[in-house]
């Protein structure tokens, strides 16, 4: 090492000049892809690929990313009884890899594809829908009437009292229906028939 005192010669400056690493062909390493048997070069100590091999390596890297994505999707569908024949045809269309010109790969993302709605379409007419809306209360009322008749036959006073309170509350709700319809109008599908107030019916005498 040259002394720090005195003038510095040009030869001593060359000792501190950073050495430039020249390209050594022996550092060319071939990595094999075990899935497809592909060979693409990787240069140790270099940040970019060779110019004459850059485009070819870029395509191989693109295929490698796509193959890994397809394999992960097929592993998810394995054992579920799903037919994966169409998956291999549709996935390459939905995958894109963002690559820069210098060979650097960025994160890949799914392309924007038209989303097909899987919700069931409404195929029944409005008349059948109204019929279903009418049949649901009838079924509920028939079950309630059967339960009430059994309780009356058993003669439980507490059960008869609770049924009487329920009937009175139901009659009160029927009388309030017209006012509720004016305050909160409903859809035209159910508003075809004018709802009229139902007169209060005398409850059956308790035994």
UniProtKB/Swiss-Prot annotation:
One of its GO terms (cellular component) is virion component. Transmembrane segments: none annotated. Signal peptide: none annotated. It is found in: Virion. Its main location: virion. Keywords: Virion. InterPro entries: Corona_nucI, N2-like_embe-CoV. The gene encoding this protein is included within the N gene (alternative ORF). Structural protein that is not essential for the viral replication either in tissue culture or in its natural host. Belongs to the coronavirus I protein family. This is Protein I.
């Amino acid at each position: 090492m040259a002394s720090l005192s005195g003038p510095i010669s040009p030869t001593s400056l060359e000792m501190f000049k950073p050495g430039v690493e020249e390209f050594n062909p022996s550092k060319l390493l071939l990595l094999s892809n075990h899935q497809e048997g592909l060979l693409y070069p990787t240069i140790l100590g270099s940040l970019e690929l060779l110019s004459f091999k850059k485009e070819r390596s870029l395509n191989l890297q693109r295929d490698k990313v796509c193959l890994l994505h397809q394999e992960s999707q097929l592993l998810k569908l394995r054992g579920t009884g799903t037919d994966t024949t169409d998956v291999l045809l549709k996935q390459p269309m939905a995958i894109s890899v963002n690559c820069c010109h210098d060979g650097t790969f960025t994160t890949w993302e799914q392309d924007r594809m038209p989303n097909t709605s899987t919700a069931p379409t409404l195929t029944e007419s409005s008349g059948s829908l109204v019929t279903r809306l009418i049949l649901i209360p009838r079924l509920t009322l028939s079950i309630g009437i059967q339960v009430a008749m059994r309780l009356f036959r058993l003669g439980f006073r507490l059960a008869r009292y609770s049924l009487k309170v329920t009937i009175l509350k139901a009659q009160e709700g029927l009388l309030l229906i017209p006012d509720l319809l004016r305050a909160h109008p409903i859809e035209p599908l159910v508003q075809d028939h004018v709802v009229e107030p139902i007169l209060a019916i005398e409850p059956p005498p308790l035994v």
